[in-house]
Amino acid sequence: TLMGLLPTRGKLFYRGEDISAFTLEERVMMGIALVPEKRELFGTMTVEDNLELGGFRQMRMGNRQWRSRIDDVYDLFPRLKERRTQLSGTLSGGERQMLAVGRSLMSNPDVLMLDEPSLGLAPLIVKEIFSIIETLRKTGVTIVLVEQNARAALAVADYGYVLEMGEVSLHGPAAELAQDSRVIDTYLGAARKD
């Protein structure tokens, strides 16, 4: 809905401007990037070709150095550099997730939306993905994270919202939500530390 892929109800504001009627391309050009749950890579294209597609915004803005962002992505995800000529359809689930995030970062976004980045990944890869999310957060990129792994999400978040049946049931600073008995009992499944 935020990226204009589904019909919306209500209004969507970004930097004080109602962008509800904006096209997907207009939202991308404003600096909003999405990593969808299903990753949506081009499986018959190489890793590097997929990354180059992510440079659309920078290219349209006339940034002649947009290709240098590929090196930034490879610094963040060294495994992708090793597989730069490999078809993305042959990558593991964790590598595909890294590529999807890397492709979004090619646009140099102000806001990065991640939809279920840990879905279907091995625990070790989930830890690696969330470490990268934390690194990105520290660089000043605003991250909007939709995640079923509440513990991992709250560990990297500044602020959180708990949705039940599509409605906000709780919200607040992530550290407070992580200690809230309702969140612990329902989503974290562990005794609260007082």
Locate each region found by the language model.
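Glycine-rich phosphate-binding loops of nucleotide-dependent enzymes
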Residues: 1-194
